[in-house]
Amino acid sequence: MELIDTPYYLNETHKHIEKVLSFNDTNVVNMQLQIGQTVAEHEVDADVLIIVKRGKVIFTVEGREVEVSQHNLLHMAPGERHSLRAEEVSDFMVLQIKR
């Protein structure tokens, strides 16, 4: 068992992106963004799960916009091009799982 802290950094910094765990073919990344911050379009050679702990993030996946919050979960297949924009101050987990 391993309990991993994911502290809130946005009181101290403008943006925070950190890989917090890597095992087998899985990476777990904590992203914390201020309102309006973006991540440019890219793709990942893995299944991607987005789990929002705080805030609201707009993902554009293959041209389609979806709002991700604490009330839902986003799955993207390997190779799906996507970008994102924080609609609110946001703290979320990104799980990249290679097939």
What is the role of each PLM region?
Residues 1-25, 60:
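A short, N-terminal "cap"/entry segment at the start of jelly-roll beta-barrel domains
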Residues 28-44:
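Conserved short histidine dyad/triad with adjacent acidic residue
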